[in-house]
Regions:
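Hydrophobic residues within beta-strands of alpha/beta enzymes
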Residues: 23, 72, 115, 179-180, ...
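Catalytic alpha/beta core domains of metabolic enzymes, predominantly
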Residues: 41-54, 58, 63, 85-235, ...
């Protein structure tokens, strides 16, 4: 496939259409001027005239593609929407879909079917909503083009894998997507094994036994919002999702950057543990203590009423949600559900359970619970992120509980916090938006990312874009608070939001100047 970044008069597009198998175009700059973040006012007639300009330029290119059997990829990126689209729709999924549909409608009118679509964002919430909206819009117009999935600027290491699995995995769980790319700020050869593991995991659930379920009336898969649940001791409602760490194996080593809110100790005696931990204890081993709470299983549900405690947990699966169980959950205002699954399609089973609770009008808080047996940390990251991420982006889940046999418990804790960060449901650390690098990157991206992380990783909630070049960097940083963008060999430009505030800084001074910029704007903490 041939990528064209900017082509002022369509020449490069037309020449490449006769020489390669596929050409990628970006609707954000195909006809519209380079993005300036300006607000433009159009009458309906003027707006229609702008779309006609697209047709005048696009149709000759399509004709060359037809003559040579060349396919095209319409690649819409959240960070490179045109000022025209931004002015009418804002920086929204609706704007991304509108930008794509302008070109798709011309393709259909010109009887040109050889089209692949990619529509990407670095924000997983935006990415998933946009693709779901695009599919809905295409289906309404009887369009069925292949979709390529990806999370742009996902970053590196654990964060890059988790963010990619949340976005791509959610859509694959929906049955959406024909090809994928995992974009990591690492050596290119690192991407393919990660993508393969993710696809293989989703395929494991093929031909699973059917799940008999219904979607709650009025549930909108595009405009999702968090399910309304009652509050039980700070769990549910508008409180951030909690993290429950399974320490029933006796592993009590902690990473104090990823401290869980609760720990499950099973049959362990709570008297053997310090008072500063909030503990889940199997109900029949529970002792009345201010920091200990009983945990029941489905067969013990009738015993819930016998325990005088402000917070109780019960582990349930979809199949446990009988009419009687729903009555118990509605009546007892101190209970929180740990929603588990043993089904091969665990996401489908847990989705079914959440919709059953919605339809029953049961507002019990729900902590999503999964069990894995992975010695491969990367596989654990991908599997848990794809599964939990799907439900969180649907608006489900007042907390997470991840148990894994094969790795230390702190690995599971970091995964849970990373997934909540990637779904933007709970922010616990600095977020980095970094590109996968390309030939335009004229500095050592991986080393630079490591240096910036070392200097800024304590700035909880701050978003920092680290981009290879000036061509796509400013746009692709999305909603970053600060940006570090390559400006030429040995030179860096720094951004505050979308504004370039320092240009052509020597690379050796750039990280220090970034820290200084953050301090000057009052966003630094020691």
């Amino acid at each position: 496939m041939y990528y064209v970044t900017l082509d002022a008069d369509n020449t490069v597009y037309c020449i490449s259409a006769g020489e390669v198998e596929k050409v990628r175009i970006n609707p954000g700059n195909y006809v519209d001027k380079v993005k300036t973040f300006s607000h433009l006012e159009y009458t309906d007639e003027e707006y229609a005239a702008e779309i006609e300009k697209i047709r005048e330029r696009f149709v000759p290119f399509l004709n060359i593609c037809k003559a040579h059997g060349t396919a095209i990829r319409i690649g819409v990126n959240h960070g490179s929407l045109s000022d025209r689209i931004m002015s009418r729709y804002g920086d929204t999924p609706e704007g991304m879909v509108a930008s794509c549909m302008e070109f798709l409608r011309i393709c259909r009118e010109e009887n040109f079917p050889d089209v692949v679509i990619s529509i990407k964002a670095s924000n997983t919430v935006v990415m998933v909503r946009t693709v779901r909206l695009l599919v809905r819009t295409m289906e309404a117009e009887n369009m069925h083009y292949p979709l390529h999935l990806g999370v742009t600027e996902a970053g590196d290491g654990e964060d890059g894998r988790i963010k990619s699995a949340v976005g791509i995995g959610t859509l694959l769980c929906d049955g959406i997507g024909d090809t994928i790319r995992v974009s990591l700020s690492e050596d290119p050869e690192a991407e393919m094994p990660v993508a393969r593991k993710l696809v293989d995991y989703i395929r494991e659930r093929e031909n699973h036994r059917p799940i008999e379920a219904s979607m709650a009336p009025g549930f909108d898969t595009v405009a999702t919002s968090r399910r309304i649940s009652r509050v039980v001791e700070g769990i549910g409602g508008t409180f951030s999702p909690v993290v429950i760490s399974d320490r029933s194996s006796g592993d009590f080593e902690f990473d104090y950057l990823s401290l869980p809110d609760y720990i499950y100790i099973g049959k362990e005696d709570p008297d053997n543990l310090p008072d500063n931990f909030r503990l889940l204890v199997d109900a029949h081993f529970w002792k009345e203590r201010p920091n200990a709470f009983p945990c029941f299983i489905a067969s013990e549900a009738e015993e819930l009423k016998d325990y005088d405690c402000p917070l109780k947990f019960i582990r349930l699966t979809y199949m446990d949600l009988t009419d009687r169980m729903l009555e118990i959950l509605k009546a007892d205002k101190t209970v929180v559900v740990l929603l588990s699954t043993h089904h091969r399609n665990g996401v489908g089973s847990q989705r079914a359970a959440m919709h059953k609770l919605l339809m029953a009008g049961c507002d019990v808080p729900v902590v999503l619970h999964r069990d894995f047996r992975e010695t491969d940390v990367e596989l654990l990251q991908l599997k848990s992120a794809a599964d939990f991420g799907t439900l969180l982006l649907d608006g489900f889940g007042d907390g997470l509980m991840l148990h894994n046999e094969g790795c230390e418990a702190v690995v599971s804790d970091r995964c849970m916090f990373g997934i909540l960060q990637a779904t933007r449901t709970r922010i616990s650390k600095t977020e980095y938006i970094s590109c996968p690098s390309c030939g335009r990157t004229l500095y050592d991206l991986q080393t630079t990312i490591a240096r910036i992380k070392e200097a800024t990783s304590h700035l909880k909630g701050l978003k920092i874009g680290i981009m290879g070049c000036i061509v796509n960097g400013p746009g692709e940083m999305a909603d970053a608070d600060y940006g570090y963008v390559g400006a030429g060999r040995g030179q860096i430009s720094l951004y505050k939001g979308k504004e370039c505030v320092l240009k052509n800084i020597p690379e050796e001074d750039a990280v220090e100047r970034l820290v200084q910029l953050i301090k000057e704007n009052g966003d630094w903490v020691n």
